[in-house]
């Protein structure tokens, strides 16, 4: 299963690439599909490509939901006696 996730643009390298913060890690991503990006913008990232701009509030809501999903999965594994 593949997910598209919100990431924050930390640095613009050129017209086709940028550095984004993904779960605390910095990674170079392809931004060729989008125009007028600025440092601090949030984008939806899928398999290394920025697909769409996203406002910060929606990005934060989505990231919070993904974090909650991770916590629920860990709790379910613990309840079943599995290691996370």
From Swiss-Prot:
- Entry-linked Pfam families: HupF_HypC
Give the top-rank taxon of the lineage listed in the UniProt record for this protein: Bacteria
Pathways per UniProt: Protein modification; [NiFe] hydrogenase maturation
Enumerate the GO terms in the molecular function aspect: carbon dioxide binding; iron ion binding
Q: Name one GO biological process term.
A: protein maturation
Q: What function does this protein fulfil?
A: Involved in the maturation of [NiFe] hydrogenases. Involved in the biosynthesis of the Fe(CN)(2)CO cofactor.
Q: Which family is it part of?
A: Belongs to the HupF/HypC family.
Under the heading NCBIfam families, the entry gives: hypC_hupF
Q: What is this protein called?
A: Hydrogenase maturation factor HypC
Instruction: Write down the species.
Output: Azotobacter vinelandii
